[in-house]
Design a protein with these regions (language model features):
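Short, glycine/charge-rich beta-strand/loop segments that flank catalytic centers
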Residues: 1-7, 54-65, 83
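Positively charged, Gly/Ser-enriched RNA/tRNA-binding surfaces
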Residues: 1-50, 102-265
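Charged, amphipathic alpha-helical linkers/stalks
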Residues: 46, 64-73
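Intrinsically disordered or highly flexible coil/loop and linker segments, enriched in small
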Residues: 50-51, 90
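A short alpha->loop->secondary-structure connector
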Residues: 51-52, 74
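Residue-level detector of family-conserved "landmark" positions at structurally sensitive sites
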Residues: 55-58, 77, 190, 209
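Acidic, His- and aromatic-enriched active-site or binding-groove loops in soluble protein domains
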Residues: 71-103, 228-230
């Protein structure tokens, strides 16, 4: 337990929250451990008075798998996956894809002139935080893996439609599979992939949301939140998910899988 920094959609909310959490460090059985964290959260909820609420489940892994199948250059796939959690910047990236501003002939021609000029410069010279050598490598990648102007609009449409998917949890697999089939994306999701398939647990309605899980950068798989209504107020009382890279990102030389959750106090 202790204080944690959390961004909020409501500007009136404090970014510092007192929380009590629980986690499985060194998670070996992903699906069962994910389910265990949600089950523990639901058991803890029994001690709280509320009239109704919702359990929303998402999965970052599904988004990243879908992005990996889209017909866009590798650098764009990495960019979209990396910035999924930064909603405003992510939307800016989609706009660039949709309008093809990054492949505008005038801008490309200017870039080519800069490229030819930089070829004559010191490769170790630093420009805007990057060495000339790094900048030249990035430009070479663009030349070898160009993005067709006609593809951007269609890819953006697919991503936006995917992020709109929200349904009762027992329909999650069928909704996703219909979407993948419609857009000719080579992916299939089994309903057992999700930690729960019951649409109602106690007083909670259970949903799948494709866009949920963008609040924190470190989530890598299953994510969830529990919102309750108490005294006519909607309260986000619990949230959590899987973070298989966080411990190594913090300096561990060994990859340690983990999943956890926290209650707001």
């Amino acid at each position: 337990s202790g204080q944690a920094y959390r961004k909020s959609q409501n500007k009136k909310d404090s970014i510092i929250r007192s929380q009590i959490g629980f986690e499985i460090i060194g998670s070996k059985d992903e699906k069962n451990d994910d389910k265990e964290i949600i089950t523990t959260s639901l058991k803890s909820l029994q001690n709280i008075k509320y009239s109704s609420g919702s359990l929303t489940i998402g999965n970052i892994e599904i988004f990243n798998l879908m992005i990996s199948k889209l017909n866009i250059p590798k650098r764009w796939k990495l960019r979209l996956s990396r910035h999924f959690w930064r909603e405003k910047y992510f939307n800016d990236l989609l706009e660039r894809l949709e309008t093809n501003s990054d492949v505008d002939p005038t801008i490309v021609e200017i870039d080519k002139k800069r490229y030819l000029k930089m070829l004559k410069e010191d490769l170790f010279k630093v420009v805007a935080g990057r060495s000339v050598n790094e900048i030249l490598k990035r430009f070479n990648n663009k030349i070898k893996d160009p993005r067709g102007a006609s593809k951007g609009k269609n890819v953006t449409k697919i991503i936006k439609e995917f992020l709109k998917i929200k349904c009762p949890i027992n329909k999650a697999a069928s909704e996703l599979n219909n979407f993948f089939k419609k857009n000719k994306i080579n992916l299939v999701v089994d309903q057992n992939y999700f930690p729960n398939s019951n649409n109602k647990i106690s007083k909670l309605n259970v949903f799948f949301s494709a866009s949920f899980g963008r609040q924190l950068e470190y989530y890598t798989g299953m994510v969830f939140k529990i919102d309750i209504i108490s005294n006519s107020k909607i309260i986000n009382c619990c949230a959590g998910g899987r973070y298989d890279r966080l411990i190594s990102d913090l300096g561990s030389k060994k990859k340690v899988s983990a999943v956890g959750a926290a209650f707001n106090l």
